[in-house]
Amino acid sequence: MKKNPVSIPHTVWHADDIRRGEREAADALGLTLYELMLRAGEAAFQVCRSAYPDARHWLVLCGHGNNGGDGYVVARLAKAVGIEVTLLAQESDKPLPEEAALAREAWLNAGGEIHASNIVWPESVDLIVDALLGTGLQQAPRESISQLIDHANSHPAPIVAVDIPSGLLAETGATPGAVINADQTITFIALKPGLLTGKAWDVTGQLHFDSLGLDSWLAGQETKIQRFSAEQLSHWLKPRRPTSHKGDHGRVVIIGGDHGTAGAIRMTGEAALRAGAGLVRVLTRSENIAPLLTARPELMVHELTMDSLTESLGWADVVVIGPGLGQQEWGKKALQKVENFRKPMLWDADALNLLAINPDKRHNRVITPHPGEAARLLGCSVAEIESDRLHCAQRLVQRYGGVAVLKGAGTVVAAHPDALGIIDVGNAGMASGGMGDVLSGIIGALLGQKLSPYDAACAGCVAHGASADVLAARFGTRGMLATDLFSTLQRIVNPEVTDKNHDESSNSAP
């Protein structure tokens, strides 16, 4: 199961900002860009040595840019300690950047050789270092590099990517063409969005970070993107006052569960309870009342009528609508009534499909689309959504207001004017029915506990993914059910509790 270390930063920089900031930082600290390249190469070399101490023949793939310059430094350091190194370099009519040219010269002066990229690879190669393409890539790699990438991916040796796996777009996490499937990735100066969302989860392997000694400069900079992970839950979820009562923790109304979908509304209701909601009322089809009360007697379950809905809206602190709502007249009428609710609300599932038909803008609303729902909301294809998840989350906010949670690997949370978070928890076990219903209940509960809509969305996504990570660490990802999260969710939303049986290898709160 992929899990990023807690030591990596929680600030994330746009790729263009890093490239500009690198020069500013070097000037501010009296460093040259070549000195930063030497530090990057040293950091990458140390990751290679630490992760693969027995590797004795390294194949270093160097591109024709500063990422390739890092590769020359890695190769020279490896050769200096007696490791056999075969270095393949991409040819180009353009001159190398100054820093990369210096690194290349140092490699040659150390007795290194440079081979054409089309040579037959030695059979003894047991580690591949990817320094082909860096963070400036904005399109699919050209054919000659794609062939190298495919060759590396088909080779049995592990791959360490320098700064970013070649072919992965640093800004978006998209892969428009061939991409290195790295086992380890060492990135420098600051995290890039593309390392945390989209296809990054498939290709980065274990992520490492090195600031290259720029910490003092970085500390004085502001960034608009944040990485959110389980160790931050204690920031949002404080211990409760001993004298608090159920009314203090939110009255949540959940609306949905049309014919045949009682399970969706039941999962949302229980998730809200497990995430700490004081009182949860479910409005649903009359046929669902007995099964829901039998399954979870702590829920208050009523038939959805215009009268019960009107009374419940007056009672509620928060409304969650959508799980199992359907798109027939029953669900449409309920949604029309809820539209003008003035307190926090969350729309999911069929509420989003109906919203796509009749769009409106509400600043007190959290929407939680998966990529298919987001595509309908924005009138585009799923491929367009996945090609730039951060931008699409921001577009959702611009069009619909409030907070947008674009679900998927590396869930993105966006709010006006420029709040942007990437959720760095979760796993492939969550690709199963009902997970979105559970998330809706969790976020709804946190809204009821007086978190701001943006904080509730971020904390809810983290608690959701962290609960699944505990399960994955114990049992694996295959066969995980949405209701399995209830066994770990209570522990996760009480981060102040020390559980001696808690598996610290999981990606959950300490």
Language model feature labels by segment:
Residues 104-109, 178-179, 199-202, 396:
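Short, conserved catalytic or adaptor-binding loops enriched in Gly and charged residues
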Residues 73-153, 290-304, 310-315:
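N-terminal small/polar loop signature for handling phosphorylated ligands or for N-terminal nucleophile
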Residues 126-127, 132-223:
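Internal gly/pro-rich beta-alpha loop/helix module
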Residues 1-89, 97, 184, 195-349, ...:
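Small-residue (G/A/S/T)-rich helix-start motifs and N-terminal tracts that mark the onset
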Residues 104, 145-146, 179-182, 335, ...:
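Amphipathic alpha-helical segments in well-structured domains
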